[in-house]
Structure formats: structure tokens, C-alpha cells
């Protein structure tokens, strides 16, 4: 998947949160309507994957972290904060690092958006 000799250039990370409050009839993405998500278990899996890929991408500069889905705005802000913090530890980061999150306006309130901003999210779509 990665050429260890190709350690130049920018790098983007994508985190897929496959959960939604309900499955939209038009959606073809890998998503599931599930209320009881084990956030700690998902965080552990994301962090393990990050460790693996960090070894394969040494020397690359991280310029984007993207949370997509599903409905990633259903994630706990602490999970997002832990992922962003670990990404900053594992990779050199571009000064303008974009941390972007898809959000459904019906499933996120201002207080949660503020918590995501505190976690490092600087773009919501």
C-alpha cells in the first residue's frame, strides 16, 4: 500500500464513522443505524491504525484530518480530541492543518460544536 522510500509530500488522514441515527434511503455508503456505539473501542482501533500507518509514512507532512461517515458529528468530542492529538504526535503537521468533520445539523448542538472546536476541528461541512 505504501512505498517506504516515498517519504515526501503531503498526507491526509480519513476516519470513517459508519454510524447514523437512521439510514437515509438514498445513502449508498457503509453506514449503520446503531445507538449503542462503544466509542472507547473505536478509539482504540483508530489509534492502532494510526500507529501502523505512521511507520509507513515517516517524513510526510500531515495537512488534513477528515472525519466522514456516516454521521461523525455523533462521535464523542473526547474521541476526536484524542485522534487529533495523536496525529500531531505521530506526524509533522502543516501549519495550516485542516481538521474537517461532516455534520448533520439535526444531530449536533452548539455546545457539541464548541467541544469539537476545542478538540481541534476547524472545518465543518
Provide a role label for each language-model segment.
Residues 37-39, 57-61:
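N-terminal juxtadomain amphipathic helix
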Residues 20, 46, 67, 101, ...:
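Conserved, mostly hydrophobic/aromatic
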Residues 37, 41-45, 104-111:
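Glycine-rich anion/phosphate-binding loops
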Residues 1-13, 58-60:
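N-terminal [4Fe-4S]-dependent radical SAM core
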Residues 46-58:
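A short, N-terminal amphipathic alpha-helix
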Residues 7-41, 119:
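Canonical Radical SAM [4Fe-4S] cluster-binding loop centered on the CxxxCxxC motif
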Residues 62-63, 76-125:
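Radical SAM/AdoMet-radical enzyme domain recognition
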Amino acid at each position: 500500500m505504501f512505498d517506504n522510500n516515498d517519504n515526501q509530500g503531503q498526507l491526509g488522514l480519513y476516519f470513517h464513522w459508519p454510524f447514523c441515527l437512521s439510514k437515509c434511503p438514498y445513502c449508498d455508503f457503509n453506514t449503520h443505524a446503531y445507538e449503542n456505539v462503544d466509542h472507547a473501542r473505536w478509539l482504540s482501533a483508530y489509534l492502532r491504525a494510526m500507529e501502523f500507518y505512521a511507520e509507513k509514512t515517516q517524513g510526510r507532512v500531515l495537512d488534513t484530518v477528515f472525519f466522514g461517515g456516516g454521521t461523525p458529528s455523533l462521535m464523542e468530542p473526547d474521541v476526536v480530541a484524542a485522534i487529533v492529538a495523536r496525529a500531531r504526535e505521530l506526524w509533522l503537521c502543516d501549519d495550516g492543518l485542516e481538521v474537517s468533520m461532516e455534520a448533520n445539523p439535526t444531530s449536533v448542538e452548539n455546545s457539541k460544536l464548541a467541544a469539537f472546536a476545542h478538540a481541534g476541528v476547524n472545518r465543518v461541512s
